Amino acid sequence: SCGKHIWIGGTRGTVIHSSDGGANFHVSNVPGADSLDFRDLAILDDKTVLLMSAGPAESGAAKVFRTENAGESWEMVYQTKEKGYFFDAILWEGKQGLILSDPAGPFYGLVRISNKGRDFSLLNPATHPELQKGEAAFAASGSSLQKTKLGYYIVTGGGSKARVLYGKDALNWESIYAEIPGGEGTGFFSLGVRDAKNLWMGGGNYSRIKEGPVPVLESLDAGKTWSPVVNAPAYYVEKILWADPYWILSGPAESSAFDPVKKRWISLGKSPYHNVCRVGDRLYGVGGRGQIGFISLSQIQQLFLSKE
């Protein structure tokens, strides 16, 4: 979301846009993208958006489309067909952006974006940790890659350990946390950022949505150390979001809110939401089959008050 603009990517080349803070939504399809799953996007300004498709590059599913007229027309601005590439997340920060891809070589694929989303260049990291067998990032909500003023973070799964990788810049990476068992389809799916020091992460296994094999963890020192969040719900988490003054968790089984002052949790219901964004006082959740829902922060406050 950006200002009153909400953008949602979907399957079969679908894109949904609201320009009035969620009062009305317009559904359209990107021409030539019928087979693509738009799993993440980057909003550069009111009119400029980059849509990222997730899928195997060798089958033509690793593409980026760009609009500079708020979706009236779209242009494909980047594609790779190299086997192994699978885009997981895209972010934009000021004047440049970054795409995270599953590994196609010795490390994750990282694509630098510049020139207002027109230019793309594949990075060649100078230093990076060795990959575990099967290790990858998950494209669930586009939040396996995050940026703070201290650098970049990637949260991973699929390998024997779910890890946190840190890069002061996008060219020099280290593994800073590898304590939680991973495995196929299992690991960290989302990293949430309150500020440069205070981070949360969570995940699970996408085939066991009502179980919590991966704990929700908090760091207060920019990712150097992590500890379990007390009484965190045990379900598969696809998105963690800081929506001041609450932490929000969402997944296909349930959503929850945590008040860090009172150290208390409440459930926000069982509706399946893969991703959540904040627009003003409202949180918008996006689920499968075109489902969009919202709840206001004031409603969440009332839910906490009613439980006291």
Residue ranges of each PLM-predicted region?
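Residue-level hotspots at or immediately adjacent to binding/recognition sites across diverse folds
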Residues: 1-308
